[in-house]
């Protein structure tokens, strides 16, 4: 009887640790998630690292801009935290893309764009990679439809 009890205890401990491992954090390795081109904005690629922005959960979106890519003025229904990972991102606020009204945001810097605030970004000096996080649902709503 004692042997059976020890065996059951060992199985329970082993099964418990397996369940704990399955429910623990699951790292996302960005290099394993492919970028997808965004046809509305040539030169812009993105990939969802956490969530999809479609529901009321947290999300993390990675964006890559080819040199001189301009993301036209747009808004989001949620506030977004943006961290520049590489390159220098030029950001402006307003309903018109104004190259004289941009501010340079270097790699490592973070800024917040409040919900509903029209803004635009530009990879003026070369390729830029940044990531945005927030709580969905989210979307891009262009002030004017981007030209092809």
Show which residues each predicted segment covers.
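A short, N-terminal "cap"/entry segment at the start of jelly-roll beta-barrel domains
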Residues: 18-59, 102, 145-148
